[in-house]
């Protein structure tokens, strides 16, 4: 299980932020350039043209562990999409704020950040969130359906740890299969591949699979008689 949250409060203004998205000061025509001190002559071209937030989304979506977002402050732009793609979201009642700023800066999340958001809150609310770019409280987000629980700020970490205790107290194989089952309907063939890979791994644990391997290595006919068909 993974708990994902932000540092805070800010040394500059005392405010809290979960994640405020991509730094527009280092956004170029080909993506974001994170290497410090680079110039157009020294920059590694292979590092350009990347939107790192998409890699974060894929990691969260495809890892077998359950990811809980602790929204302790602003979740804006790409940060908003991060909480959307996570498995569960717990938000601070006092400081949790949600705002989709993509259209304000000439950007748009045409993947999980928008389409999966619509799965959570419905098409009308999702379009409102993106088209208007308004600010929403933690209670607003909970009412819409994109936040699981709203708790006092001081209890945010304790609540997440309690959720983690419950999650880790259950079958790890069942939990990972559940995550991939939930994802499968939205993830197309990639989702099917992830689910099928886990199913294959489970099959490899059986005596039946061991017999299939052994008969091949031993160059003999297989004996499937101990393994009846289940109906």
Name the predicted role of every residue range.
Residues 55-62, 70, 76-130, 144, ...:
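CoA-thioester-processing core
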Residues 50, 54, 77, 111, ...:
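Glycine-rich phosphate-binding loop at the start of an alpha helix
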Residues 6-56, 106:
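Glycine- (often His-adjacent) and acidic-residue-rich active-site loop
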Residues 88, 128, 132-134, 140, ...:
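Well-ordered beta-strand positions
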Residues 129, 181, 185, 198-204:
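Helix-loop "lid/cap" segments that line or gate small-molecule binding pockets
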Residues 13, 91-96, 147-194, 207, ...:
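C-terminal long alpha-helix characteristic of the crotonase
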């Amino acid at each position: 299980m993974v708990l994902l949250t932000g540092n805070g409060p800010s040394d500059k203004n005392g405010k809290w932020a979960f994640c405020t998205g991509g730094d527009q000061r280092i956004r170029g025509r080909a993506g974001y350039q994170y290497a410090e001190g680079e110039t157009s002559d020294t920059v590694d071209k292979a590092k350009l043209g990347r939107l790192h937030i998409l890699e974060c989304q894929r990691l969260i979506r495809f890892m077998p562990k359950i990811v809980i977002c602790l929204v302790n402050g602003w979740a804006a732009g790409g940060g908003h999409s991060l909480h959307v793609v996570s498995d569960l979201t717990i938000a601070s009642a006092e400081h949790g704020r949600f705002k989709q700023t993509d259209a304000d800066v000439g950007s748009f999340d045409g993947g999980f950040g928008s389409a999966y958001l619509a799965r959570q809150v419905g098409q009308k609310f999702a379009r409102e969130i993106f088209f208007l770019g308004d600010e929403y409280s933690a209670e607003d987000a909970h009412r819409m359906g994109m936040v699981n629980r709203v708790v006092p700020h001081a209890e945010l970490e304790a609540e997440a740890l309690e959720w983690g205790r419950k999650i880790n107290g259950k079958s790890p194989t069942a939990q990972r299969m559940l995550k991939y089952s939930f994802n499968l309907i939205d993830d197309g063939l990639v989702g099917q591949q992830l689910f099928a890979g886990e199913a294959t791994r489970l099959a490899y644990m059986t005596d039946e699979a061991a017999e299939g391997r052994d008969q091949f290595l031993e160059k003999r006919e297989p004996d499937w008689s101990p393994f009846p068909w289940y109906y």
